[in-house]
Amino acid sequence: MTSERTPSEHDDGAPRSRSRRRFLAGTAAAGVGAGALAGGAIGAAVASGPRREEEPRLPARTEPGFDHVVVIMFENRSFDNVLGRLYGPDDLPAGESFEGLLPDERTNTSAGGLTVGTHVYEGATDSVMRQPDPDPGEEYPHVNTQLFGTVDPPENAGRTVGAMTAPFNAPADASAPTMSGFLEDYVQHLRVMKKGQEPTAEEARTIMGGFSPEMLPVFSTLAREFAVFDQWFCAVPSQTFCNRSFLHASTSHGFVTNKQGGGYEKWLADDLADAPTVFNRLEEAGRTWRVYFDALQVVSYTGFLHAPVLEKYWKTHFSTMDRFYADVENGELPDYAFLEPRLVFDHNDMHPPTGVLHEDEVDGTPVYDSALSDVRAGELLLHQVYSAIRESASTTGSNAVNTLLMATFDEHGGLYDHVPPPSATPPGDGREGEMGFAFDRLGCRVPAIAVSAYTRAGTIVHDELHHGAVIRTLSALHGLEPLTARDASAPDLFGVLTLDEPRQIGDWPTTVPQYLPPNPEAAPAHPAHVNRDKPLSPPAVGLMGLLLARYGEPGEDLPTTYEGAYNALLKHGASLFGGS
């Protein structure tokens, strides 16, 4: 089946392309209809697509490298979940190795004796593309169980995170993760969600599943045609806030949870004004930077997370995505550009769904329709960002030859990965670790892909990296002082430069995203108007928590639905940040 995809009204300024090829390339891969089976049928169009030999040559740099860095960070996927099957023993680049799942699958066994192996998701396409459903546990105690198979004290097994107690499932010796507890932790998580009812084997097994390359053609094409990192770990074995904080501040100020131990207010405390970010370092050095977020979201996640040091730049250095696409087209990218996916309404951040367990659990009416928490929406966003950079041809400013695009994820989100996280350098910022964590070990592997004109197709970077590599690279480029001991000792990204001469635009692949069904959240004028009771994802709840912690009124309830988020954003956030 093939059909032409019409861009969503919420593409937020993504250019329609000089030749319209960018969106006309978005045809449906064979078998992506509502009833199609996943595994071999869907997403079959992984092919690179046509090359554009007719494009004029762009000037090379005086030496291999890049002048502009663009980073986009998605949500809550492990390396094995997204890229674990990128290469098998029969299709590796010559002389290369790859730390993936093939040819040997892995297993986990639950305390109840259920054994589940790693597998490719199967089933109806629209269901498959939002797995795992529901969202696994991602907080520090959950991750301890996932990595070590421990539950300590035993009573933590039946508790929510807020009720768990020390040592928060951490073993006495945390030096050798076994990666054996993902299934057991998910079983416990489902049991709590189902109020004590035992989950079925079918419900539990999704935690060990993942996508084939054919299912995620954009990620797979870019990973194969440029560089993939098979040893990139997130900064903290926990959830969103602390990992996104480490990306730009090289610390999470001792926090390992979004809201435990002080609420969302802890991220906005006055004493964090002495903890600068790499944005502050760039500003002090006279370099340019900008954070781009989706207009539908109204406020920037990054801006709020680092409000004590970035609020003064909200009007001047934060813009919506239409400005990003214009900056790319006009050759006006800053030295560093950070992109936020849409995290609240109609989200394209690739975060797994949250809410009820089954799509037909409420009065027999589907709770999740196609493209809700759908990884294809994230694929489309990456396709739009990459395609814009691929077509950037300024001869005097930023262009495809002098720009590095990095795509990665904040954390593994509780999804299985088989590689034990290594030890880490603590930030050394003098802040006591929440839940007794010493910040001396990294979190799980996450997908990470680099796109550069100076990167040979089939590049696999085996160096052990983590989120601190972004700060370390920017510091090396612009002579910045380290923020903490973590980024001071971090490796950089220059290992992706494997060519002496740049690949011209005509040698870059044309990515072909899968057909993305219309999202019922995207119409009419605003998702909140027809999806009032839809539950917010954890990142969206966190953003609402920060918004109310800063601007909310005493006693104001934390929004947990689309309608609540819409009202809160309209009331408190409408004029806080710069626009296009």
Kindly label every feature range from the protein language model.
Residues 2-7, 16-18, 25-580:
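N-terminal pro-sequences and low-complexity stem/linker regions of secreted or lumenal proteins
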